[in-house]
């Protein structure tokens, strides 16, 4: 049997697809990589939060599964909307890579010059950096990882922010410092490679053989918070679940839409079922003026 693996054409996306292909080939499954440009690849000028729709990097590939053009789609899990087409499912995750954000610069955060220019299109990252350094200036940059790094010199930027996992998976030789995940809580599911397939059929059963169960549970916990609070992919929120004892410690960081206030919630969870109590606590305690937390139905 050969499994057709759909991916975006960027070097990072292809590298991640190749990681999935290697895992499948290790259990005796032949694979073929199919590249396809998404809406998010085509519009590289506007910030993600201004495009006005969710799943800009994943919808086209998922539709290709439904049309039978590919068997699976490989995504960065953080790009997958909290709700996907009901005939599809996230069937597997590879072992989680680094979840940290990285400040790509010859400076670390403390030594960045006054009023330094930092490149990012993420509203979460902008607010986190502003909260740490109110003097910083920001420049919207989009495009693949290599393009963003090239724009540092083109735009005269002092730093850019990106996922450390991307740097590691591409084997890039760039100077960077890791940002503290307790202050710069990453996007939900950052560092996780997810594989989407049809809910029914042989392919899903095969994917279960390459699934990393610990990572899958972390993904479910973080996604459950997003789903229950009805958070959009462009809201200024960081969520991270990590193993702790026999359960998980979760940290959730919420910024007001103006970026001038932040609320942080930490809780120990035994398993996925404990997310309900965390979500209830967040609803009760987050300031109403944040405006994007859905009330309980």
Curated annotation (Swiss-Prot):
Gene Ontology cellular component annotations, sorted alphabetically: cytoplasm
Positions of modified residues (S-(dipyrrolylmethanemethyl)cysteine): 233
GO MF annotations, alphabetized: hydroxymethylbilane synthase activity
Claim: tRNA-binding is one of the keywords in the record: no
Cofactor note: Binds 1 dipyrromethane group covalently.
Pathway: Porphyrin-containing compound metabolism; protoporphyrin-IX biosynthesis; coproporphyrinogen-III from 5-aminolevulinate: step 2/4
Family matches, as Pfam families: Porphobil_deam
Gene Ontology BP term (one): protoporphyrinogen IX biosynthetic process
Main EC class the enzyme belongs to: transferase
Keywords: Porphyrin biosynthesis, Transferase
NCBIfam families (alphabetical): hemC (TIGR00212)
Protein function: Tetrapolymerization of the monopyrrole PBG into the hydroxymethylbilane pre-uroporphyrinogen in several discrete steps.
Note: The porphobilinogen subunits are added to the dipyrromethane group.
Protein name: Probable porphobilinogen deaminase
The organism of origin for this protein: Thermoplasma volcanium (strain ATCC 51530 / DSM 4299 / JCM 9571 / NBRC 15438 / GSS1)
Source species taxonomy: Archaea, Methanobacteriati, Thermoplasmatota, Thermoplasmata, Thermoplasmatales
Gene name linked to the record: hemC
């Amino acid at each position: 049997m050969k499994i057709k693996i759909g991916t975006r054409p960027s070097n990072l996306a292809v590298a991640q697809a190749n990681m999935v292909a290697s895992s499948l080939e290790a259990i005796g499954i032949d694979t073929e990589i199919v590249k396809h440009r998404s809406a998010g690849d085509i519009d590289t000028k506007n910030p993600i939060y201004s495009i006005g729709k969710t799943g800009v990097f994943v919808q086209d590939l998922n539709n290709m599964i439904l049309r039978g053009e590919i068997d699976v789609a490989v995504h960065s899990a953080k790009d997958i909307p909290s709700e996907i087409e009901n005939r599809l499912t996230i069937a597997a995750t590879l072992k989680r890579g680094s979840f940290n954000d990285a400040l790509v610069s010859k400076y670390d955060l403390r030594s960045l010059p006054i009023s330094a220019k930092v490149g990012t299109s993420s509203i979460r990252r902008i607010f986190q950096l502003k909260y740490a350094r109110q003097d910083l200036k920001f420049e919207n940059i989009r495009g693949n990882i290599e393009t963003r790094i090239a724009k540092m010199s083109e735009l005269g930027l002092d730093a850019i922010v990106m996922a450390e996992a991307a740097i590691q998976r591409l084997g890039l030789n760039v100077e960077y410092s890791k940002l503290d995940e307790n202050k710069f809580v990453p996007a939900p599911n950052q560092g996780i490679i997810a594989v989407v397939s049809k809910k029914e059929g042989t392919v899903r059963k095969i994917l279960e053989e390459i699934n990393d169960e610990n990572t899958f549970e972390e993904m479910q916990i973080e996604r459950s918070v997003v789903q229950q609070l009805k958070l959009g992919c462009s809201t200024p929120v960081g969520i991270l679940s990590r193993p702790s004892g026999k359960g998980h410690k979760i940290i959730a960081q919420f910024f007001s839409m103006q970026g001038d206030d932040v609320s942080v919630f930490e809780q120990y969870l035994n398993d996925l079922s404990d997310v309900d109590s965390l979500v209830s606590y967040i609803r009760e305690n987050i300031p109403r003026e944040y405006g994007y937390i859905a009330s309980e139905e």
